[in-house]
Amino acid sequence: MNICVFCGARPNFMKVAPVIRQIENLRREGKPVESQIVYAGIANDPTLEDSLFSDLGIRRPDVFLGVDCVNLNELTGQVMSKFEVCLQDHPTDVVVVVD
């Protein structure tokens, strides 16, 4: 099973960290589970310090969509468009959206 965990903002990582850790535990136990962490923002987002991920016990996102805009309509459109491409590139069985 391939699980995609989508986070749109920094606080979402705190909410979903227990889920990500459990997915990793299952994988280490030999269960057929893979995961991908997708972040809507940019890779060099200053709010995503390495310490955040080490404190939460999870890895940094695997994919950064690079959405960086202020207008809500533009933001929504860019996230939908770029996430669709991401899912086409990385087939997924389950999507967990954290908001």
Predicted regions and their residues:
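Nucleotide donor/acceptor-binding cores
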Residues: M1
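Conserved nucleotide-sugar phosphate-binding/catalytic loop shared by glycosyltransferases and other
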Residues: K31-L75
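Active-site and donor-binding regions of nucleotide-sugar-utilizing enzymes
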Residues: C4-C7, N12-Q22, R28, L52, ...
